From Swiss-Prot:
Coiled coil: none annotated. Belongs to the binding-protein-dependent transport system permease family. CysTW subfamily. It comes from Methanocaldococcus jannaschii (strain ATCC 43067 / DSM 2661 / JAL-1 / JCM 10045 / NBRC 100440). SUPFAM superfamilies: MetI-like (SSF161098). InterPro entries: MetI-like (IPR000515), MetI-like_sf (IPR035906), Phosphate_PstA (IPR005672), Phosphate_transprt_permease (IPR051408). The lineage of its organism: Archaea, Methanobacteriati, Methanobacteriota, Methanomada group, Methanococci. Residues 68-271 form the ABC transmembrane type-1 domain. Its main location: membrane. Part of the binding-protein-dependent transport system for phosphate; probably responsible for the translocation of the substrate across the membrane. This is Probable phosphate transport system permease protein PstA.
Amino acid sequence: MSPIKHKTIRMIKDKIFLFIVGALTLLAILPLFHIIISIVEKGLPIIMERGLTFITGTLSEGGIGPAIVGTLMLTFLATLIGLPLAFLAGAYAYEFPNSFIGRATKMLLQIMLEFPTILVGTFVMGMLVVPMGTFSALAGALALALILTPYVAVYTEEAMAEVPKIYKEGGYALGCTRAQVIFKVITKMAKKGILTGILIGMAKVAGETAPLLFTAGGLYEVYPTNPLEPVGAIPLLIYTLVQSPSIEDHQMAWGAALVMLIIFLAIFVPIRYALKDDIKL
């Protein structure tokens, strides 16, 4: 076979391969675009019809204001509760990978990643809701914190493991303690991976419904102010609305879904952009 013919065959194979990969990639992302388009198409009319009332009003007024505030409150509290534990667990798994506790920590985190979230809700219900005698934002946040923890911890451990060992050795050579090396050297070098894990964890808990059924309670007529009282959330409200036979409630559910999508994009896209190499945090 001549070199020219061999090169031609190779180019044809490359183009076929690229075409197949491109087609499969398009096939994989089509459902995502379909979901986004459906949410915008069905959710935008109800928002345009009711205007600001849909964003700020209570459920009886035709709005989802308390649910929006409840989602933000639950996500913030869950991050506040779960982030320190998750970071420390990830750092410990990185620093002591071969110890019994280190291996047990990694195994437990992997199990928690796949653990049914509804069981987390029932666990927190028995531990906190039943003794308190009421649903509360605190109980919902605790359930969400347990869900957030493994995501942040695993990403933290993996991000730290990718830092070249020369930086760790350099820290020890300068006389730094183990804690100083981990928190001031390794963490700084791995900050993008750690922040990515935090974002993924926050996105996960902000969209959770199952654990909130047993913990948060759902409250949509007043804005939440006390973490010890019941609270609503957008995913929980959507779940409630879609069970109704009313077409108007279904339209509200689509509008709530669009609002939640906008909140996600408004928060996470700028932060993801800030994680690029050319922008310093």
